[in-house]
Amino acid sequence: MSGGLTAERMLAAYAQGVFPMAESASAAQLYWFEPALRGILPVGGVHVSRSMRRFLRHCDWRATIDNDFAGVVAGCADREETWINAPLLALYQDLFRMGHAHSLEIRAGEDLIGGMFGLTLGGAFFAESMFSRRSNASKAALIWMSSHLARCGFTLWDTQYPNPHLASMGGRAIPRLEYRRRLAAALRIPADFTAHALPDVQALLQEITQTS
């Protein structure tokens, strides 16, 4: 499955809880997945360690939204093994133009050092992938994204598969049926990913302190 997949069909599939992946960057075929255990992160409540708070307090990084979607997707695909193939790259660009795909960039000065991207439907954010060119950049992206999703009214943060890195930030796995219930509820919520600007790092730290 790949040739007949459109951005509209892809959104309809996500609304049912399934998502596509390729076996490799060079593979033409896409396959549908619906894990028995689905990874999620707490909107507005990711765990931020003391060491990460200290790191952010003394760094000069900043975060932006939808500033370089193509660059973030390229960064996520730039690894030895990736499930992002050419058909998916084209679909993500279509979804970005439609307003259903978004990126968060982490920058040191003007350099893109990390980020993540995902899809939105109602109050659900489907995180697709993230990358890091410096230590802690992917953690910073998760922290900023957590704050942003909460500010914009999202209630579900889907990470597809659980993993130890996400678990260290508060991620957990839930059964498929529970995920479907949460997804159905989130789809009824009119969240807007572009409703708020991102805070600077000092405002982000203050927000973390108030909610922890």
From Swiss-Prot:
GO molecular function annotation: leucyl-tRNA--protein transferase activity
Chief location of this protein within or outside the cell: cytoplasm
InterPro entries, sorted: Acyl_CoA_acyltransferase (IPR016181), Leu/Phe-tRNA_Trfase (IPR004616), Leu/Phe-tRNA_Trfase_C (IPR042203), Leu/Phe-tRNA_Trfase_N (IPR042221)
GO CC list: cytoplasm
Gene3D superfamilies in alphabetical order: Leucyl/phenylalanyl-tRNA-protein transferase, C-terminal domain, Leucyl/phenylalanyl-tRNA-protein transferase, N-terminal domain
An annotated GO BP: protein catabolic process
Reaction catalysed by this enzyme: N-terminal L-lysyl-[protein] + L-leucyl-tRNA(Leu) = N-terminal L-leucyl-L-lysyl-[protein] + tRNA(Leu) + H(+); N-terminal L-arginyl-[protein] + L-leucyl-tRNA(Leu) = N-terminal L-leucyl-L-arginyl-[protein] + tRNA(Leu) + H(+); L-phenylalanyl-tRNA(Phe) + an N-terminal L-alpha-aminoacyl-[protein] = an N-terminal L-phenylalanyl-L-alpha-aminoacyl-[protein] + tRNA(Phe)
Top-level taxon of the source organism: Bacteria
UniProt-annotated location(s): Cytoplasm
UniProt entry keywords in alphabetical sequence: Acyltransferase, Cytoplasm, Transferase
EC number assigned by the record: 2.3.2.6
Family affiliation: Belongs to the L/F-transferase family.
Stated role: Functions in the N-end rule pathway of protein degradation where it conjugates Leu, Phe and, less efficiently, Met from aminoacyl-tRNAs to the N-termini of proteins containing an N-terminal arginine or lysine.
Protein known as: Leucyl/phenylalanyl-tRNA--protein transferase
